[in-house]
Each structure stands twice: as structure tokens, then as C-alpha cells.
Amino acid sequence: MIKANTILGNKFVAKNRTGASYFLSSEELKSLGYIDINRALKAVPGVNFYEEDGFGLRPNISLRGTSPQRSSKITLMEDGVLIAPAPYSSPAAYYFPSVLRMEAIEILKGSSQVQYGPFTTGGVINMLSSSAPEEGLKAKFQTSYGSFNSSQIHSSVGRSTENLSYLFEYLSMNSDGFKKLNSGENTGFNITDLMGKVRLKSAEDSATPQFLEFKYHFFDELSNETYLGISERDFNTNPFDRYAASQEDNMDARQVQLMLTHSISISEQFKIVTNVYDNTFSRNWYKLSGVVVDDSKKGLETVLAAPSNYPNHFAVLKGLTDSEDDALFVKANNRVYTSRGVQTKLDYHWYGKSGIFHDLEIGTRLHYDEEDRFQWEDGYRIQNADMLSTSEGIKGAKGNRISSATAWATYAMYKLKYNGLSLSPGLRVESIKLGREDFGKSNPNRNSSDLSSRENQITALIPGIGFNYTFSNQLSVFGGLHKGFSPPGNTPGEQAEESINYELGSRFSIGRLSGEFIGFFNDYSNLLGSDLAASGGTGSLDQFNAGSVHVSGLELLLNYNLAAENAAVQVPITFAYTLTNAIFQSNFGSDEDIWGVVSTGDRVPYIPQNQWTLTARLEHKKYELNLSSRLSGVFNTQAANGNQSTVEQVPSNFIVDLSAKYHLTKQLRLTAQIVNLFDEVYLVSRVPAGFRPGHPFGVYTGLQFDL
């Protein structure tokens, strides 16, 4: 039977689904205590990512080899509704929910994805926010402080009665950042999260149990983050430097979500769940975009790729020399995103002859989203390593357009269970109308005189089928076949990204050892790349066809408890390994030069071939100790074959984190966390422009109190 806002709901469902899935429970999230979603997901097989800012503010997540840039090729949801700023028209996740306010995370991969879209190739990540208590009054307060003047305050209070429940939550995260400007200015962030939920419930003995829940969420971020990295030489000597020309860079962002959920069980066999949602995300990322010397303007990535070729430009970026007026251009990437819609799903199940279980789930969603760009570029000069304003740009001159999408999606999923066999065929339909209205560079009032429009429409049928066969409580086999889909852009005639995806796996339990082993193969007929500034592009968001690609891989998950028979102490160990081979099957050259010149046999950028994670926990009623280690394999930022030099390469790294918790009383606990235990200096990315370091050694201590 369907649940209101969840995909899985618990680990048992995840282990019995006809497709690869993972349920990251509340206990796991609490034991890790991460604010960085990348670190929270690192133990999940099939999840690839590359870091950018060291705190996970804007993650780049890939599932099974999808393009990771800004997590724009996976379906992101919070409480069962789409949460990316504009999921169809501009899916790049410049907003990502704070992992600290989540009570669980659900990851779905493989063949049973037709219920969720629009991105069906890699998978789904559904973030489950804190829920009201099931009974009585509950409250919690936790705080921490540590390296780089970083602090957190997280508190909530909730109550549940027979007909009413509510939860109010507050989260504040702050840091001065670990990168250093010579001026000593802050390079960190300030984030505030507020959430409220109120649920009206029918009586427990009602013939038709139902509830109506209203959710409000507010998010505010001010982060002094930049796209400007540093040169390779400077990275090798002072990896945490920030150049003077980035001192004005900052992201000012705000997100508001309104959501209404209604759930009714008409009978024990028939249930309907409806969501109405409205998300608004506004942001202005004011950041350096170019440098001019002697009337020669160069992009940041051009200068940092070869500083010796542009010594004067490079000196201005570092603040080593005074410049002319308007030597530095800082772009106001000012955008407002809207995402709203209504979705409903119904579930009816029954038992037929010979004990065969049948379940039919049907869902539909009407959705609209848009990205409104109104951007400009200001001029600055450098004097004594300080930036001084010299000119104000014309509003709208660097982007004055609205991209939008109207989408209707529906699906039907049938499930059959007989003895140990489960089958789940399904079909999804996506009908999408994408458009763009460009008002021109010199039309701040947006009259129709300079308006140019374009439109693209597509309707896609997305079938899939999965199976699971349980031989015993210790062994099952599952697999499936489904069509992968990713919406195109608004360029007329542009085709969607399509693939045929296969998977086959087994779940097993042998004594203290349990786990799963999965093989997958994704056959792309036309992989779509996106021109994102975050990956070194121009930021137009236009998509380009990268041709045929084969992505194959293996996922291994092992769980073993060293002290399973010890009542006083538990020592669970988890090992996760992912092998991913993402290979181009054709030649092409990207006009945007994001991936470089591609030849058959080259590896798709940003996808490491190997990665593994090993975690060990020591659990006692008075204390907990968690050790987590991860090896991230080498990857390239441009297409590469096995013999390519390291010019565009991000080397592998091995990082260990440690956390501990001590229970002073039943309600009061002390916490401690060490990030990057051995203080490894490691490169996480060469994009958007220059070298970027990972989080250095950091110590954080805190206090938790529950009522």
C-alpha cells in the first residue's frame, strides 16, 4: 500500500523491492552527523559525486553514471514532491535540502522507477523531512561548535493528539570557511532553515481514515562562495588560498515551500494520496566572470588553465598589481525559480485465486516551472589588493529571459506476488512543453519590441518491468529492464535523452554476513550534456547531443556484525564498492568545449571508475564510535582514454572521518566529530575555474538534548 510522501519507508521494503534501492535511516544519519550530503551518501553503492565547496552546499551527484553537474540528471524530491528549483526547464540544483533536518533519505535505482520522473535513467533521491511525533509531546535541541568558527543550532518541538499533530523546526548553520583571502574576509556561509507541519487527522476508529497536512518551509543562505579556483602551482604550495579578485563573490539565496498533503484510505484495499505544492527559489550569485588587461578580456578558466600565457591577467586575479578601471567583471547571476503543481496517486490491492496478490498503483501530476533570469555585470578595479567599484552594469544586459515548462505526467504500475515471485511491469508517460521568452539585452522593462520566443514539445512513453524472486530468507534474485529518459531543452526539435537500462542482482544473508551484488548496463542512444558555468561552460544551459554512450558497472554492499551475539556491544561493519565504466561510443566535438573533443572509447568526464567506502561502528548503551573511510577514484574533467595525461585529471583520494557520542543521561549526549582525520590535502575538482581543495582536518564538538 502506498504511503503519503515516501518511496520505501523502511529498510525492509528496500530489501524486497524489484529494483536496487537503499534506505538511509534516521539512526544512520544521526550517527554520522554530517552537514554535507556528499558525505552522508558516500556509503550508498551506485552513487558518484564530486565535491566543490567542501560543505556540500551545491552537490554534484550522479546515480549510475549520469552526468553529476549540479545533480541535474537525477530526480530530486523532498517528501515525495520535486524539489529542484525548476525540475523541467532548469533542473540544476542550486538549492539542495539541508541533510541535518532530514529523518531519512531514500535512494531508488533500477527498473522500478516509472513511478517517479522526469529523470528515469539513474534514479531518485527522496529526502524525508522531520515528522511530527506519533504520540505525546517531544522536543530536541542540539548544538555544536568547531573548526573555522563553525557552529550549528538545531531544535524542534512537536506534539500529537488524537486529531491533531504538529512540528516546528529551526536550523542554523554558520562557518567562516576554510579558504583564506589575504584581506582576512569571511569565505564561509550562514544558513537558516525554518519548517512547520500541522496535520489534522480523523479519529482512529474512522471507517475512512484520512489526514490533511500543511507544510511550510523557509530557507535562507548567504555564502561567500566563488567559481574562481587557484592555479596548480598555488594549489601545491597554498591549497586553501582564495585570490583577491574573488573577494566580492557571494550567493544570496532564499527558498519557500508551501505544500498540502491529503491521504484517505477508502477501504483496507483502496487508498488515495494527493499533494499540492508551490516552491519559489530566488538567488543572486554575484561572482567574478572575467578579467581585462589592455582591452583583452579573458575567462577565468582560460587564465587558470595556463597562467604563464596570461601573466598580467593572472597578476590582477591575485591582486599582485593595481589594475585599470573595469579590469574585473562581476556578474549578478540574478534568477527567480518557480515550481508548482498537483499530483495524486491511488492504490488498490486484492488477493486473487491461489493466493496471488495483486496491486495496481496509478498516479498523475500536472506541473509548471520556470526560471526567470535578470542578470547584469558590474566593473571593478584592483588597488592594493582591494576591489573598488568602477561601473554599474545595465540590468538585464547579461540575461533577460524566462525559460518555462508545462508538464503532464502519468503512470501505472502493476505488482503481482505469487509464492516467492514478484513482478512489477509499469508505464510512464511524460508530455512536456518547453519554452523561452528572451527580452533582449537592452530591454530592462521587458516590453515586446525585442521579444524573441522559441518552443519545444515532446511526449515520451517510458516502460519498465522488474522482478524479485525469493528462494529463502537468505537468498533472493532481482532485476529488470526499463527505459531511461531525460527531458530536452527548449531548442525547437531537440530530442530527449534516451537509454535502455538493465540490471540483475542478488540479496543474500549468510550467518552474520548480509549484502547485495548488482550488475547494471545503461545503453544511451543520445546522451545530453548541458552548458553549465559550474562545469566550465558559458552558463547558457543549452543542451548538446553527446551521442551513444555505454555505462556498465557493479555495485557491492556487505554488512557484517563482529559482535552479533554480544548483548552489551555491537560492532557493525559496512563495505560498499562501485565500479562504473562510462564510455563514449561515437566521435564528436562540443561547441561549448565542456568535454573537449570526444573519440570513441573515451571515458565520460566526472565519473570515477572505482570507489569504495568502509564504515565501522562500536555501539554501547553509554557510547558510540563511528569510523568512516572512503576511496574516491581518479576522474577527468574532459573526455579521456586510458593513456591520457593528467592535464585534466582529478587524482584519487582516501579520506577518513571519525565521530563519537557519549550518553550522559537518557536525554543528554555529548558529541564529537573529526572530518578528514589524517588531514589529507586533496583536489576535488578543476571546475568551474581552477583547482579546488576538499575539506581539511576539522574538529567539531556538541551537545544533544531530547525531551
Q: What function would you assign to each model-found segment?
A:
Residues 1-30, 38:
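Short, acidic, small-residue-rich periplasmic hinge/interaction motif at the N-terminus
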Residues 38-81, 85:
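Extracytoplasmic beta-strand/coil segments of soluble accessory domains associated
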Residues 81-109:
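Short acidic/polar hinge/loop motifs at secondary-structure boundaries
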Residues 112-114, 124, 128-159, 170:
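Short strand-turn segments of transmembrane beta-barrel domains in outer membranes
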Residues 145-174, 182-226, 250-254, 260-266:
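Transmembrane beta-barrel wall of Gram-negative outer-membrane proteins
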Residues 205-213, 253-439, 558:
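Face-selective signature of the C-terminal outer-membrane beta-barrel domain
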Residues 337, 354-361, 365-369, 398-524, ...:
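Structural signature of Gram-negative outer-membrane beta-barrels, strongest in the C-terminal barrel
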Residues 417, 472, 544-639, 666, ...:
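Gram-negative outer-membrane beta-barrel transporters
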